[in-house]
């Protein structure tokens, strides 16, 4: 479940450049980063963040794409009404080595860089809903929420039949929870559409339980 122990306390995150192309390809494989058609332009623009975690090989990477870009992910996000003005950025799902345990730190840093880089609180992150691997999906969602992200939406988008949409802008007020939902709950997309969000969670006998509150 949610990783609470760090096997290494070395955190060596940086903005990747063209000089890191081979290291990035070694991590990502032939398919590259999820939801990013071309690596080279993103490297040239300084849009990919990575963490070596004190190792010789790259351990984690994700792209921060401006919402005004014409790539499939920003375009799909704008069409869904998230960041329709084109301001801000969206973080692609990260690629991680199997034993990488610092995802929360990596997400926090990437989101802080996005806020500074694009001077906007319209910073989003997405995660494909993978119900074929529920435990892994629960763990990733818990990591995102633990990093300070808020689950705001769930809908079909480029790259996934259902995409979890997180905002780096937290809830202004904490109100009594409406209900608890699992990621596989068919009511979850409708509840989120009605103006509820999940910024915290618990664990039950069936896995991750999102705590939904009105925004």
Regions found by a protein language model. Give the residues of each.
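Short amphipathic alpha-helix that is part of the acyltransferase structural core
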Residues: 1-43, 50, 176-182
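Active-site rim helix/loop that mediates acceptor-substrate recognition in acyltransferases
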Residues: 25-58, 63, 67-69, 187-193, ...
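Conserved acyl-donor/pantetheine-binding loop and adjacent beta-alpha core of acyl/acetyltransferases
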Residues: 37-41, 45, 50, 57-98, ...
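Conserved GNAT acetyl-CoA-binding A-motif
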Residues: 88-89, 115-134
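Conserved acetyl-CoA-binding loop-helix of GNAT-fold acetyltransferases
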Residues: 93-116, 139
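Conserved active-site alpha-helix within GNAT-family acetyltransferase domains
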Residues: 129-154
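C-terminal "cap" of GNAT-fold acetyltransferases
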Residues: 157-180, 207-215
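Charged/polar low-complexity intrinsically disordered segments, enriched in acidic residues
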Residues: 175-191, 196
């Amino acid at each position: 479940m949610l990783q609470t122990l760090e096997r290494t306390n070395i955190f060596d995150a940086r903005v990747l450049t063209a000089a890191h192309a081979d290291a990035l390809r070694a991590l990502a494989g032939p398919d590259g980063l999820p939801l990013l058609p071309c690596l080279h332009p993103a490297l040239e623009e300084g849009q990919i963040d990575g963490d070596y975690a004190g190792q010789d090989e790259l351990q984690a990477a994700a792209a921060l794409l401006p919402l005004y870009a014409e790539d499939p992910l920003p375009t799909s996000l704008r069409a869904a009404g998230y960041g329709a003005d084109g301001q801000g950025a969206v973080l692609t799902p990260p690629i991680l080595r199997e034993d990488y345990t610092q995802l929360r730190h990596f997400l926090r840093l990437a989101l802080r860089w996005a806020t500074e880089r694009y001077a906007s609180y319209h910073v989003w992150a997405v995660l494909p809903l993978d119900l074929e691997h529920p435990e892994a999906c629960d763990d990733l969602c818990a990591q995102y929420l633990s990093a300070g992200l808020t689950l705001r939406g769930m809908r079909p988008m480029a790259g996934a039949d259902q995409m979890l949409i997180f905002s780096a802008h937290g809830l202004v007020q904490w109100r009594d929870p409406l209900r608890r939902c699992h990621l596989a709950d068919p009511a979850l997309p409708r509840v989120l559409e009605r103006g509820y969000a999940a910024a915290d969670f618990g664990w039950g006998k069936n896995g991750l339980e999102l705590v939904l509150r009105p925004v």
